[in-house]
């Protein structure tokens, strides 16, 4: 009988004792023979560590000295983790015993597969996909992310339409399976992101290194969503800032020269629309994001990316304009957009 590859499931925790109490036991019940479950704690101020040591002393805990966010926290924690595969799992994700094997089977099917995700359904409405990744992430030519099963805030019911194994652009950070050597080769997440869209940036860089990103349709998990960082101006700021930084760094200059100005204009429109509709925190968040990007450029914090390719040559890229397809043409689902998008 062949030995199963070692898998380390790493949960990054920040003041998530209530999530650990609710979901950690399910992770420990995973049906996989070569598994280590690790909790990396991002300097929590609640009783997460005390509770784990009392109720789950067998779980290895990696204590980080400060809250380094999702990106920096995982970068630090994974330096202390061994395994063929890492599975980065949010603490607010519920799993069933058989969730992991389909992910590993997908990864093992081809050595060029660098990362994969399961189908992610909503914990509170289980017939629907969940916002953060749904059945696998795509991106359009302006850098707007969407997913099979979720376009902007329009979320589909899971009727089995995305149960296949298929290449995508990005795998969700809510449940991300990645080869440990691929993570190291890509030099991990960009810690400057802190949180939000760091997994899209990483998957983009993995594709530039020649890896494929997959959705493993036979694997299914349930995600509460928004379990760590509350909705507000900071969340908006991080999303807008990180998206612009990702585009600035990963696009070849021939595309960067027109994509960034167009996105800048569209972001300004989005900011004023939010303000006129009474969403002042969103307006402030977008404004702060743009000032932060200017500071990022001036400070020279960007990392040089080798082997840049035109975005449309990568997998999981919609060559049309998502905002036009969605708002002007009325295409609300992934299938409609990919089938009819221009």
Explain the meaning of each model-derived region.
Residues 10, 209-328:
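Active-site-adjacent helix/loop segment of glycosyltransferases
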Residues 21, 46-54, 63:
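Acidic helix N-cap motif at the loop->helix transition within catalytic regions
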Residues 63-81, 91-93, 102:
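Glycine-rich, basic loop-to-helix element that forms the pyrophosphate-binding segment
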Residues 86:
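Short aromatic/hydrophobic "clamp" motif used to bind/position activated sugar donors
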Residues 94-144:
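Conserved donor NDP-sugar-binding/catalytic core segment of glycosyltransferases
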Residues 163-220:
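A short, conserved alpha-helix in the catalytic core of glycosyltransferases
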């Amino acid at each position: 009988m062949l030995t199963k590859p070692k898998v380390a499931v790493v949960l990054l925790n920040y003041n998530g004792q209530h999530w650990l109490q609710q979901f950690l036991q399910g992770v420990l019940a995973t049906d996989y023979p070569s598994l280590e479950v690790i909790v990396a704690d991002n300097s929590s101020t609640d009783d997460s560590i005390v509770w784990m040591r009392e109720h789950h002393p067998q779980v290895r805990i990696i204590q980080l000295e400060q809250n380094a966010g999702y990106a920096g926290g995982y970068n630090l924690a994974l330096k202390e983790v061994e395994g063929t595969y890492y599975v980065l799992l949010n603490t607010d994700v519920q799993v069933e015993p058989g969730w992991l094997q389909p992910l590993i089977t997908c990864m093992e099917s081809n050595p060029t597969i660098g990362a994969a995700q399961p189908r992610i359904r909503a914990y509170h409405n289980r017939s629907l996909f969940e916002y953060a990744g749904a059945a696998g992430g795509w991106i359009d030519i302006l850098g707007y992310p969407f997913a099979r099963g979720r376009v902007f805030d329009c979320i589909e019911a899971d009727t089995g339409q995305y149960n296949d194994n298929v290449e995508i652009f990005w795998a969700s950070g809510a449940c991300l399976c990645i080869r440990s050597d691929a993570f190291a080769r890509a030099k991990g997440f960009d810690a400057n992101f802190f949180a939000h869209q760091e997994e899209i940036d990483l998957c983009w860089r993995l594709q530039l290194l020649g890896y494929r990103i997959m959705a493993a349709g036979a694997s299914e998990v349930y995600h509460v969503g928004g379990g760590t960082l509350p909705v507000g101006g900071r969340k908006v700021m991080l999303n807008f800032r990180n998206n612009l930084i990702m585009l600035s760094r990963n696009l070849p200059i021939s595309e960067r020269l027109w994509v960034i100005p167009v996105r800048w204009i569209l972001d300004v429109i989005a900011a004023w629309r939010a303000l006129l509709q009474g969403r002042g925190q969103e307006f402030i968040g977008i404004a702060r994001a743009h000032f932060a990007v200017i500071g990022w450029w001036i400070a020279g914090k960007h990392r040089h990316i080798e082997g840049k390719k035109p975005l449309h040559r990568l997998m999981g890229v919609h060559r049309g304009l998502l905002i036009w397809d969605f708002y002007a043409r009325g295409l609300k689902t992934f299938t409609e957009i990919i089938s009819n998008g221009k």
